[in-house]
């Protein structure tokens, strides 16, 4: 009985460690990604300031003709925030996933401990044949041990899958949102919404051939 209680306590401790370590690792990776994302946002925001190509405005200050800071000054550059499920939801779903493996492993081990017979020294050495009843119990006990190991492996696999795919989906969603925002910003620049020629001229550019005659009278 003491051996069974020791095994149950050890299994519970191992389960808590298995459930806690991946979460700590994922939390550290998420904090690192968020910090790198903030740094990348700052680099993108001020990337056009140092790309001087020789153009000057009316006051003689250098102006970048390729990159404008309209979206930066107006605060229109999108900030990508990765969504996460609440901590209680993640914990509850992990407990549900580990319930069957833990119960199965404990039950299988208790069955194996109950069924496996104790062999005599002569039977262990092979000098005496093992009776058929003991052979059947030994086979059932070994099968129960194999089932306990299988349930333990299932619990480890579910714990691993609970954390790893979520991280990859978060990174993919951030990359997709960032790519869409950059495409929209570039499209707006190409279509003339942030034309540097228009900004230096102080008004919209009038295409050739569309100039209207001005009445001077």
From Swiss-Prot:
Subcellular location: Secreted
Disulphide bond pairs: none
Annotated spans, Disordered: 171-217
InterPro entries: Dense_granule_Gra7_protein
Similarity field: Belongs to the Gra7 family.
Residue positions the entry lists as glycosylated: 191
Protein name in the entry: Dense granule protein 1
UniProt biased composition (Polar residues): 171-183
The keyword Amino-acid biosynthesis is annotated on this UniProt entry: no
Composition-biased stretches (Acidic residues): 208-217
Signal peptide: 1-19
């Amino acid at each position: 009985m003491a051996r069974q209680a020791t095994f149950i306590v050890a299994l519970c401790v191992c389960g808590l460690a298995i459930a806690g370590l991946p979460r700590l690792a994922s939390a550290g990776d998420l904090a690192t990604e968020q910090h790198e994302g903030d740094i990348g946002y700052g680099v993108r925001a001020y990337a056009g300031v140092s790309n001087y190509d020789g153009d000057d405005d009316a006051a003689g200050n250098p102006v970048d003709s390729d990159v404008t800071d309209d979206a930066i000054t107006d605060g229109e550059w999108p900030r990508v925030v990765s969504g996460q499920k609440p901590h209680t939801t993640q914990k509850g779903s992990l407990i549900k996933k580990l319930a069957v493996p833990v119960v199965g492993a404990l039950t299988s081990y208790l069955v194996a401990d109950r069924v496996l017979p104790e062999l005599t020294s002569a039977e262990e050495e092979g000098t005496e044949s093992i009776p058929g009843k003991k052979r059947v119990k030994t086979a059932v006990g070994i099968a129960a041990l194999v089932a306990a190991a299988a349930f333990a492996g299932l619990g480890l696999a579910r714990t691993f899958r609970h954390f790893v795919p979520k991280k990859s989906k978060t990174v993919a969603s951030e990359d997709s949102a960032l790519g869409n925002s950059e495409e929209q910003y570039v499209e707006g620049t190409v279509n003339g919404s942030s034309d540097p020629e228009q900004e230096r001229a102080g008004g919209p550019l009038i295409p050739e051939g569309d100039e209207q005659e001005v009445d001077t009278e």
